[in-house]
A protein has these predicted regions:
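Small/polar, glycine/serine/threonine/aspartate-rich low-complexity segments that form flexible
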Residues: 20-24, 70-104, 232-240, 274, ...
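Membrane-embedded beta-strand positions in outer-membrane beta-barrel channels/transporters
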Residues: 99-101, 145, 249, 353-355, ...
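Bacterial Sec-pathway N-terminal export signals of envelope proteins
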Residues: 19-72, 78, 222, 229-270, ...
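Terminal intrinsically disordered/low-complexity segments used for targeting and assembly
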Residues: 1-10, 14-34, 204-250, 296, ...
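Periplasmic alpha-helical coiled-coil/stalk elements that build and connect Gram-negative outer-membrane
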Residues: 26, 136-251, 401, 405, ...
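Sec/SRP-type N-terminal targeting helices
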Residues: 43-47, 60, 92, 106-134, ...
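Short segments within alpha-helical structural elements
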Residues: 47, 61, 198-220, 414-474
Length: 478
């Protein structure tokens, strides 16, 4: 009883686990969206765009005046200068100072302006790189998706061939038992069945491998249950390509982000050269500063509102040298250290100035930087030509491949129709005993082979056509 309950519990757990691991059927749109959200190259390109945005903001802020605040507090002893009186003292001094400085660069050969333009263009180029990364991921995912669909349909064809052979073997055994066909036909069908089983295993392995490659592209664990939805594709109206390779290339030069990025970087290199050239020109800037100090050695008299009369010696009487005095009325009060707020207010200092810096000789650093920028500009021009040539070659190759794939599909489709009719006739004649088993089996094998070739030609053309659509900036969905 215990073993029975354990077995029932185990089966319930297994069913629950199986339900949790049910394969999810992915559509192409779901695959593309998931790949874009999780691809590491796209994430890296996104960070490059964010970095470009930061650089652009910094270039804008660099055109504004800077502002810095400084302050310190210190204790001095021994012979030192009191900062509030500028007199040497031997006493311990506790002092502090506050200050603010600002500098505004008015002109430096338009370097800041060119840096701003360069940062703006580099941000646009980074956005084009992000678009290219997304396009590359989409094209790669579609390639892997079509490979899965192709292998899935090949597996279905192999399974169908296996089922057909099994049914034929059962019928032939009955006929052999009745003496209508020789036993050799049964043995041949049994051998054919084993061959078909091997073919099913091979196609299943190819399907699993293509699914694994798709999972890896999506950053999914290999153990993730996965299936894909078969697209409903009618390519009969797409076999005719109504544009030439040159027309597709002209469209690609306007739609491909790598071309736009290369053009932008050409312009960016020109602004970089102009910015480097600005180092040869004078710099004009204005600056302003504010500072104040405090010292605990400063003394100040604070009257209390009362007065006292003091006797003051003012001279002598001629002849007798008698001292002459007078009464002086003076306010009374106390001498103490002014508060830190009063000292900061009383000791304020301000300055404004204009600076002019004319470069005369700086170890050729400015001229060398300009020469390096000129070389980078030439390299950007070459990179643009390389990318354009690579794109032209890719478009021409894709165009020829699509034409060949379309012709192959049309020929293979006619072949399937012919072999399907030949198989139908051979099957009828074999059931009537008009042809031998070898001829019948040959017709069947030829039909299934041509069906496999048609699937291969179909998905090869679909892929080639999608590549052409990609170069024209058309949607890649089905």
């Amino acid at each position: 009883m215990t073993r029975k309950l354990f077995f029932i519990g185990f089966m319930l757990f297994a069913n629950l686990l199986f339900a949790q691991q049910t394969k999810k059927t992915w559509t192409l749109r779901e695959i593309i969206d998931y790949a874009i959200s999780n691809n590491l190259t796209i994430k890296r390109s996104t960070y490059n765009v964010q970095s470009g945005e930061i650089n652009l903001l910094q270039s804008k802020m660099a055109m504004l005046p800077n502002l810095n605040f400084n302050g310190n507090y210190g204790i001095n002893w021994g012979r030192t200068i009191d900062p509030t009186t500028n007199i040497f003292t031997e006493n311990e001094i506790r002092n502090s100072n506050l200050g603010a400085t600002s500098t505004w660069l008015l002109w430096n050969g338009f370097r800041l302006f060119y840096n701003l333009k360069q940062s703006d263009i580099e941000l646009d180029a980074a956005n084009e790189d992000l678009i290219k990364a997304r396009n590359d991921v989409i094209l790669n995912v579609i390639t892997l998706y079509l490979n899965v669909v192709f292998n899935k349909e090949l597996y279905n064809v192999a399974q169908l061939q296996l089922n057909t052979t099994q049914e034929q073997l059962q019928r032939t055994r009955k006929l052999a038992d009745a003496g209508s066909v020789p036993l050799a036909d049964v043995l041949n069908l049994d051998a054919q069945l084993a061959t078909n089983e091997v073919n099913v295993i091979q196609q299943e392995n190819a399907l699993n491998l293509s699914l694994l490659q798709l999972k890896q592209a999506l950053q999914l664990p290999a153990s993730t249950p996965m299936d894909v939805e078969l697209p409903q594709v009618d390519i009969s109206n797409e076999l005719l390509i109504n544009k030439t390779a040159d027309e597709i290339y002209d469209i690609a030069t306007l739609s491909m982000p790598e071309i736009r990025a290369a053009e932008l970087r050409k312009t960016s290199s020109q602004y970089a050269w102009r910015s480097a050239k600005g180092n040869l020109y004078p710099r004009i800037s204005v600056n302003a500063s504010y500072n104040t100090v405090y010292s605990d050695q400063r003394r100040q008299f604070y009257p209390d509102g009362n007065f006292q009369i003091l006797t003051e010696e003012i001279g002598y009487v001629d002849g007798s040298n008698a001292t002459v005095f007078r009464d002086v009325t003076v306010p009374t009060g106390q001498i103490s250290v002014p508060s830190i707020g009063d000292q900061y207010r009383d000791n304020r200092g301000r300055s404004v100035g204009v600076n002019l810096q004319i470069p005369i000789f700086n170890g050729l650093s400015a001229r060398s930087a300009m020469q390096r920028a000129a070389i980078s500009r030439n390299v950007a021009d070459i990179s643009y030509l390389e990318i354009s040539n690579t794109l032209r070659q890719a478009v021409e190759t894709a165009y020829n491949n699509a034409l060949a794939a379309g012709k192959t599909y049309a020929s293979t489709e006619r072949q399937v129709k012919a072999r399907d009719e030949a198989y139908r006739m051979a099957k009828q004649r074999y059931s009537l005993g008009a042809v031998n088993f070898v001829d019948y089996q040959l017709a069947e094998n030829n039909l299934f082979q041509s069906q496999s070739d048609l699937l291969r030609a179909k998905y090869d053309f679909i892929f080639r056509k999608k590549v052409l659509d990609f170069y024209q900036g058309l949607p890649l969905d089905f």
